[in-house]
C-alpha cells in the first residue's frame, strides 16, 4: 500500500471516517435550517398569511386548491427538514457524548428519535390527507360540514397533539440531555441548549392549558433560538471543537 510520509492506514481510515461523519452532521444541520425556513414560509403562504388561520389551522379547509398545494409541499419540506435530518445529528451527538454518561446519552438519543418518529408521522399525514380534504371541500355539493370536522380533527391531532405536545416533550428531553452532557467543555452552548429545552416545555404547557396566544409567542422565540442552536452546533462540529474532536475514536480500523 502506498502511503504519504508520516501517514498510516489507521490515521487515514480515521480521517476518512471523521470527514464523513462531520460532513453528514453539518450537512444535516444546514438542511434543517435552510429547508426548515422554506417549510415555514410555505405554511404561512398556505395559511394565506392570515393571523386567524395561523391561530386556528382548521380554518385552512376553506383555502382552496392553491392552499392545498402549498400545504402539501409545506408538510413535505417539514418532514425533510425538521425531522429526518435530526436522526443524523442525534446519532452523531450520541456517538460523541455516550462515554460521559451512557444512560443520559441514551435518554437524550431516545428523546430525539421519539421526536423524529412522531413528528414524521404527523408531517406525512398532513401532507397526504390535508390537501385532499381541502380540495374536496371546494367541490360543488360537497358535505362541507363533515369535511371541515374531519380537517379540524386532522389539524388538532397533528399540530396540537403531535407537534406541540408529544414532540415538545421529546425534543425537550433531547435538548436538556445534550445541555447536561456538554456543560463542561461547551458551557455557553450547553446553557443555551438547556434553555431551549425549557422553552419547548413552556410552549407545551401553554398548549395543554389552552393558552394559544402565549403558546404561539413562545414558539416564535423557539423558532429563532432553534436556528441559532443549529448553526452554533454546526460550527462546533465543523471546527472540531471539544467534544467533537475525537468522534472517530470508535471508527473501524484496518491493518496494512
Question: Where does each model-flagged region fall?
Answer:
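Hydrophobic, aromatic-enriched alpha-helical segments typical of multi-pass transmembrane helices
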Residues: 2-255
Amino acid at each position: 500500500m502506498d502511503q504519504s510520509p508520516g501517514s498510516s492506514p489507521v490515521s487515514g481510515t480515521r480521517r476518512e471516517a471523521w470527514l464523513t461523519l462531520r460532513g453528514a452532521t453539518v450537512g444535516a444541520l444546514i438542511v434543517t435550517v435552510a429547508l426548515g425556513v422554506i417549510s415555514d414560509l410555505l405554511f404561512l403562504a398556505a395559511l394565506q398569511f392570515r393571523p386567524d388561520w395561523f391561530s386556528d389551522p382548521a380554518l385552512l379547509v376553506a383555502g382552496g386548491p392553491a392552499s392545498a398545494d402549498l400545504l402539501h409541499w409545506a408538510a413535505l419540506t417539514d418532514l425533510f427538514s425538521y425531522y429526518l435530518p435530526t436522526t443524523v445529528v442525534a446519532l452523531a451527538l450520541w456517538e460523541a457524548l455516550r462515554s460521559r454518561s451512557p444512560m443520559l446519552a441514551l435518554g437524550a438519543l431516545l428523546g430525539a428519535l421519539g421526536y423524529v418518529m412522531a413528528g414524521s408521522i404527523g408531517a406525512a399525514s398532513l401532507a397526504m390527507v390535508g390537501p385532499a380534504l381541502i380540495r374536496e371541500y371546494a367541490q360543488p355539493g360537497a358535505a362541507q360540514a363533515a369535511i371541515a370536522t374531519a380537517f379540524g380533527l386532522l389539524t388538532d391531532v397533528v399540530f396540537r397533539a403531535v407537534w406541540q405536545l408529544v414532540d415538545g416533550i421529546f425534543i425537550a428531553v433531547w435538548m436538556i440531555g445534550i445541555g447536561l452532557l456538554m456543560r463542561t467543555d461547551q458551557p455557553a452552548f450547553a446553557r443555551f441548549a438547556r434553555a431551549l429545552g425549557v422553552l419547548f416545555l413552556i410552549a407545551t404547557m401553554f398548549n395543554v392549558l389552552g393558552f394559544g396566544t402565549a403558546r404561539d409567542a413562545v414558539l416564535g422565540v423557539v423558532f429563532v433560538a432553534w436556528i441559532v442552536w443549529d448553526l452554533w452546533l454546526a460550527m462546533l462540529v465543523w471546527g472540531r471543537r471539544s467534544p467533537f474532536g475525537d468522534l472517530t475514536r470508535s471508527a473501524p480500523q484496518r491493518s496494512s
